[in-house]
């Protein structure tokens, strides 16, 4: 070991499987550690320590917890400094660099320019070891010598190399030679960094008692970000002002690994060391640097604007690089195409490129744009979005954005730091407040953008081997990469913060089979992270997930308990569109209800709304189930492990492989490549290759496409197969085609019947007659036709519809139905439907008018709670009292606008549970009905179709008519008989004595020519057999008139 060093130390590069243990160099171990069994690790600049056990030269127990807590990763270079008493100070120097302080206090550049080969000695480097001669390039020696000589000549200059640890801890430690030579004391609490011109920033300067060094904190990360510097880049600093507040002039240069290319002329007053270092950077280039190079500038306060400055010979440049902060703030992180829009409205399609270093740039097309618009010197572009396509629009020199930027520049000049020292403290405070406001604004915009572009209640988890544990976040979503080695799973802070998960307790994991598992929700005080307890591993195994699999969890709430529900693979977040979905895609994915209730729009943009009622949650679950059914997800239940459903996708055809369900393959021990037979319904066998990829996924290979063509399977179709065994050879026997997505088949049936079925099932009204086939018996299930299921689903939805559910379809978004509950009366608020408020842009508190049927207006407040739920406040109870609306009553209102003022107009009271009203009538007839009350004569009733009947997709029948004919207690099926003798199925439901004609009414009216406002007669046909379905015979006014004459 080097005797001149204060503390002995060694270095180690983290390699795969570093979590399990760490090997101490042999000479270091024999001199300091040998014979000891316990040591203590302490991260630099932290008071917390970890106790680890020593097993010979290995650090074992406790090491894993240490690296996980401090987020060590593969490739990081870690320094271990032994301070005595079996205590190590550990420093993470970031990837591919190591730091050795020289006894003369030389610049860090000498140490970081040497790239060390860590492949030998398990990645360990001791102080006493010499670097291999072949690794010391000539350029490195020259650079290090230049730095050494320059730094010794002028102690007012130093170079700061940016490491990943610096950015993580938001600190920069100043070299000892610099702080000691320039007389820094603990009275120095602030430091000013300036480029010698307009830009400057005030940062905190602190002293580290443990190491005896000064460091910059609280703002270093933002300073690097604003100057486009990442890990590996470096700054050249020169001391230009002393006193209580130090002033450093800086010059950002390119990174050592070539990530950035920011050029500027050196200031005349910079020291010789800066000049020599800049010369070193110039010598490193393989191509001589031209006199001019393009660069883009960016202002944090105007994140949509980017300004390009071009050199005279810009024609030689192939790509035009975009500013790193600009692309990061605006979420432009994927290659593709981008449009350049000039001042005449013309669009220029330009390629958007992404290099291996993560730099985004404009490719082919930007030069033509520059030439056509005479922009040879430079120009400013504004980012706008057309759906998911970015567009850069050319800004004129007189644009508001330019004037705003000039004002900002002037404001910065006014706050220049090179003024009267007496005003320095005042300026520092102003700058601090300004910086803090900028940070708050940036955080607000980032939070808002991420909420809009991503599904904040979703988190995607990828299971990797133990060596690849990391947590990463992107602009589009929350992504966690975890290892099954760990007992708990840390959740991303963005995910927990956005969803308000900040307290330890219990959380429920909901599997794909509907099985719930309780696990602990833990809180780590050290880093403020929330994590799932050890029960998450059982959840992963029970749902057939293994190393290499990715799965998405959706956060839902059951009362106050968070629930993470497992989403199927095809319902994962759409990342390619930035986490969102276009309206076109939404419309395509919306489920269509039967014609009786037209099209009901569901919120597929899935935003977590904790204010939804329980019936909304049930509705969402039913829609999810319907979506899974139509998409053809795996239907293999755990009790039917021998059955698997396969779906032909474009990826299957392109890669010539048909993936088997992981659960199916695991439960049937199909885990090795080989051969498998496919048996079709005609008894023909097809020998198919069975493949296994690197992730362990099993799939059908060569031969399956011929099998599919022989059985007339097309793209998008699904079919079910049963696994049987012939000796030791597996065989998949075809059962039937379950789903077909071709448009030609959609009109008939989603499922095609098996070839052996003699005829399709007979479907008439509410009766279906299927034929039981051998395949049905073998599969232990019977598939009902989709037409028949549609009728059942329509009746179920109509029943839920009449139980108090919101009745406003997407085509009638201006209608909303309220139900008065005891909670509404107690809290003096009437909640607006979340869908109604969203579709009508009612999202801000204020006032609204309630318009009754007499034309009177009632001014009512509109409230918005913490969860974003909109409701009617003060004034609605007076309105309800006037209209004699009581608890349990429901009424419908229509939203209209008077200029910019919203007005809710009362249509009618729909249902009432008040016992006092049962004897009379449950609903109030609207004034728009032609007659004041329906005409009831014996078994005839005359009605008029109103707008409310069309809106509700049903007709309310008077209770007097039902009682007079003794059918007020006959609920269920009913038949409507048209004038042409055609029978139409209907359904009668009861709500506290009210009988409604629901299913089939709209189609019946259209077929019989009943129009809005037209009077018609329904006749009850007296059936002698009370067990049969009641019949209502329809007669139009014209028919009645002819019969009378």
Curated annotation (Swiss-Prot):
Note the InterPro entries from the entry.
B3_DNA-bd, DNA-bd_pseudobarrel_sf, REM_fam
Q: Region Disordered: what ranges?
A: 121-147, 423-449, 606-625
Q: Which domain of life does the UniProt lineage start with? A: Eukaryota
Gene3D superfamilies, A to Z: DNA-binding pseudobarrel domain
Q: Which GO terms describe its cellular component?
A: nucleus
Q: Which Pfam families match?
A: B3
Q: Where is this chain compositionally biased, Basic and acidic residues type?
A: 130-141
Q: For this UniProt record, give its keywords in alphabetical order, as a comma-separated list.
A: DNA-binding, Nucleus, Repeat, Transcription, Transcription regulation
Localization of this protein: Nucleus
A molecular function GO annotation = DNA binding
Can you tell me where the transmembrane regions are? Answer: none
Principal location class: nucleus
DNA-binding segment(s): 7-96, 157-253, 305-398, 474-570, 643-738, 815-910, 940-1035
What's the protein here called?
B3 domain-containing protein REM13
Q: Report which gene this protein is encoded by.
A: REM13
């Amino acid at each position: 070991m080097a005797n001149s060093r204060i503390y002995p130390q060694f270095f180690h590069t983290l390699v795969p499987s570093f979590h399990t243990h760490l090997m101490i160099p042999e000479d270091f171990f024999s001199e300091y550690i040998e014979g000891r069994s316990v040591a203590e690790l302490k991260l630099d600049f932290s008071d917390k320590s970890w106790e680890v056990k020593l097993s010979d030269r290995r650090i074992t127990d406790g090491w894993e917890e240490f690296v996980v807590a401090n987020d060590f990763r593969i490739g990081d270079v870690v320094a271990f400094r032994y301070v005595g008493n079996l205590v190590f100070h550990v420093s993470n120097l970031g990837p591919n660099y190591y730091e050795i302080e020289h006894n003369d206090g030389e610049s860090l550049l000498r140490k970081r320019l040497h790239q060390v080969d860590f492949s030998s000695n398990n990645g360990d480097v001791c102080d006493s070891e010499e670097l291999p001669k072949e690794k010391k390039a000539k350029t490195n020696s020259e650079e290090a010598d230049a730095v050494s000589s320059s730094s010794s000549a002028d102690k007012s200059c130093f170079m700061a190399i940016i490491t990943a640890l610096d950015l993580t801890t938001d600190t920069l430690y100043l070299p000892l030679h610099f702080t000691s030579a320039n007389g820094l004391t603990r009275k120095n609490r602030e430091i000013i960094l300036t480029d010698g011109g307009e830009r400057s920033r005030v940062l905190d300067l602190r002293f580290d008692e443990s190491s005896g060094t000064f460091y910059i904190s609280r703002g270093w990360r933002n300073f690097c970000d604003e100057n486009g510097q990442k890990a590996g880049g470096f700054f050249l600093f020169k001391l230009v002002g002393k006193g209580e507040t130090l002033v450093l002039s800086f010059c950002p240069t390119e990174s050592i690994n070539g990530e950035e290319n920011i050029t500027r002329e050196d200031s005349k007053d910079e020291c010789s060391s800066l000049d020599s270092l800049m010369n070193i950077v110039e010598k490193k280039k393989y191509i001589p640097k031209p006199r001019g190079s393009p660069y883009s500038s960016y202002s944090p306060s105007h994140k949509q604007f980017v300004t390009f400055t071009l050199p005279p010979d810009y024609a030689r440049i192939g790509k035009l690089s975009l500013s790193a902060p600009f692309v990061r703030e605006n979420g432009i992180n994927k290659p593709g195409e981008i449009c350049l829009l000039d001042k005449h409205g013309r669009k220029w399609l330009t390629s958007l490129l992404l290099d291996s270093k993560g730099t985004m740039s404009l490719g082919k097309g930007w030069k033509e744009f520059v030439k056509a618009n005479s922009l040879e010197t430079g120009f400013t572009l504004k980012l706008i979005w057309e759906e998911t396509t970015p567009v850069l629009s050319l800004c004129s020199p007189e644009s508001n954005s330019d004037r705003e930027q000039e004002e900002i520049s002037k404001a910065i000049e006014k706050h220049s730091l090179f003024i009267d020292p007496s005003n320095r403290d005042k300026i520092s405070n102003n700058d601090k407040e300004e910086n803090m406001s900028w940070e708050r604004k940036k955080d607000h915009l980032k939070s808002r953008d991420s909420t809009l572009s991503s599904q904040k209640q979703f988190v995607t988890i990828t299971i990797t081997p133990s060596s690849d544990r990391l947590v990463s976040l992107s602009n589009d979503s929350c992504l966690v990469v975890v290892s099954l080695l760990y007992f708990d799973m840390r959740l991303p802070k963005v995910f927990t913060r956005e969803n308000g998960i900040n307290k330890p307790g219990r959380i429920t994991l909901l599997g794909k089979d509907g099985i719930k598992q309780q696990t602990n929700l833990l809180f780590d005080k050290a880093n403020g992270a929330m994590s799932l307890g050890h029960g998450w591993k059982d959840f992963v195994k029970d749902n057939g997930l293994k190393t290499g699999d990715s799965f998405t969890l959706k956060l839902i709430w059951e009362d106050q308990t968070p629930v993470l529900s497992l989403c199927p693979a095809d319902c994962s977040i759409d990342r390619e569109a930035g986490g969102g979905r276009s309206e076109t895609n939404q419309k395509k994915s919306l489920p269509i209800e039967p014609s009786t209730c037209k099209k009901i729009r569901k919120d597929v943009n899935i935003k977590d709304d904790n204010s939804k009622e329980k019936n909304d949650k049930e509705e969402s679950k039913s829609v999810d189930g319907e979506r899974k059914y139509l998409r053809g997800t795996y239907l293999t239940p755990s009790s039917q492990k021998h059955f698997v459903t396969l779906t032909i996708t474009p990826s299957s055809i392109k890669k010539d492989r048909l993936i088997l369900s992981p659960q199916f393959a695991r439960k049937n021990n199909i885990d090795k490549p080989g051969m498998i037979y496919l048996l079709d319904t005609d008894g023909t066998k097809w020998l198919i290759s069975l493949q296994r990829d690197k992730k362990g996924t099993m799939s059908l290979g060569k031969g399956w496409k011929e099998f599919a063509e022989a059985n007339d399977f097309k793209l998008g179709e699904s079919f079910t197969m049963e696994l049987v065994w012939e000796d030791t050879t597996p065989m998949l026997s075809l059962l039937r085609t379950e789903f077909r997505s071709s448009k030609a088949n959609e009109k008939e049936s989603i499922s095609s019947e098996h070839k052996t079925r003699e005829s399709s099932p007979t479907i008439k009204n509410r009766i279906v007659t299927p034929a039981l086939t051998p395949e049905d018996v073998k599969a232990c299930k019977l598939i009902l036709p989709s037409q028949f299921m549609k009728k059942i689903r329509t009746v179920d939805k109509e029943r839920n519809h009449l139980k108090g559910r919101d009745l406003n379809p997407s085509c009638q978004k201006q209608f909303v139905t309220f139900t008065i509950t005891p909670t509404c009366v107690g809290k003096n608020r009437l909640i607006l439907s979340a869908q109604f408020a969203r579709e009508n842009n009612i999202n801000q508190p204020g006032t609204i008018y309630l318009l009754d049927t007499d034309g009177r207006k009632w001014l009512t407040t509109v409230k918005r709670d913490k969860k974003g739920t909109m409701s009617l406040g003060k004034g609605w109870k007076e309105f309800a009292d006037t209209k004699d609306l009581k608890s349990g009553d429901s009424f419908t209102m229509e939203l209209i606008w008077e200029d910019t003022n919203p007005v809710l107009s009362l249509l009618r009271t729909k249902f009432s549970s008040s016992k006092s009203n049962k004897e009379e009538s449950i609903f109030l007839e609207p004034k728009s009905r032609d007659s004041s009350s329906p005409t009831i004569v014996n078994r005839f009733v005359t009605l008029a179709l109103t707008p409310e009947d069309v809106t509700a997709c049903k007709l309310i029948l008077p209770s007097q008519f039902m009682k007079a004919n003794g059918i007020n207690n006959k609920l269920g099926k009913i038949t409507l008989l048209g004038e042409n003798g055609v029978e139409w199925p209907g359904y009668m439901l009861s709500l506290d004595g009210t009988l409604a004609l629901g299913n089939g009414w709209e189609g019946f009216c259209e077929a019989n020519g009943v129009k809005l406002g037209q009077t018609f007669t329904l006749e009850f046909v007296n059936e002698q057999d009370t067990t049969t379905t009641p019949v209502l015979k329809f007669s139009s006014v014209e028919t009645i008139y002819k019969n009378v004459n």
